[in-house]
Amino acid sequence: MNTRIELITPIITEGVRSLAEVQPFERADLTVTHSLIVQGPASIESEFDEALSVPDTVRKAIDAERRGANAIIIDCMGDPGLHACREVVTIPVLGPCQTALHTAGTLGHAFAFVTVLDRLRSMLAKLVASYGLSDNYACFRAVDIPVLDISHNLTSLNAALAREAIAAVKQDHADVIVLGCTGFLGCAGAIRQGLLAQGLDVPVIDPIPLAIHVADALVKTGLSHSKLTYPPPRRKAVAGYRFPEFADGGKA
């Protein structure tokens, strides 16, 4: 069975995500396509940014299923609009954060987030709690690099990420590292080498590749989200949004 996964980047900034970055994970039976929202924030670094990103992310999810996607991944560690998207489509929708955190629980007892900015600390702690994993949360560490600056100096970025990962293991007793921004795609190898150089054999989870393979597994095993948990929205009056499918009488 061929799987087509739609990667939805929930920001409006072009060039942040390239299909070339995910092509190494494609196979003859697995294709990844990509879309960017057109209404929302330039980046997601706060609850406010996340709220702005959700409506068009949901719209893109509906459109992706109509175009034949078999699964959807929301390309942000805040998992914006995850539950709403699951309500409006029938195919699997994965949040890279939820996927990474539950996988971390199978690889160790205490995970650490290594992410972009310290201001995300409470936002990610709330997300961890919502996924029922607070007892497994070792620590939060940030490299103080805004999302849109990630690609400016990858050598410096990798060094900073490795430094924080080592500190998370040595000082906070983390035994799994979770990259806390999907913009860090491709950095896991360098961080792992930095850990090994310190004698620390600790797994480093790169959320997007993991989500791609989990989504593919769900599709190939015929699994998707329970509609008892994620029932379709009831039709009602809707103003200011492009959701005729769920507006009263089918009209926005």
Question: What residue spans do the PLM features occupy?
Answer:
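N-terminal glycine-rich anion-binding loop in soluble enzyme alpha/beta folds
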Residues: 1-55, 116-154, 247-248
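Conserved beta-strand elements of the Class I
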Residues: 6, 111-114, 175
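Extended, histidine- and acidic-residue-enriched regions that form the cofactor-binding/catalytic faces
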Residues: 9-10, 166-199, 214-218, 229, ...
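Glycine-rich, highly charged phosphate/nucleotide-binding loops
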Residues: 46-63, 156-164
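Periplasmic-binding protein-like
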Residues: 66-76, 173-182
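Short, acidic/small-residue loops that bind anionic groups at enzyme active sites
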Residues: 86-107, 191-212
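Short, glycine-/small-residue-rich phosphate/pyrophosphate-handling segment
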Residues: 105-143, 152-156, 216-252
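Active-site rim beta-loop-alpha module in soluble metabolic enzymes
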Residues: 128-182, 187-192
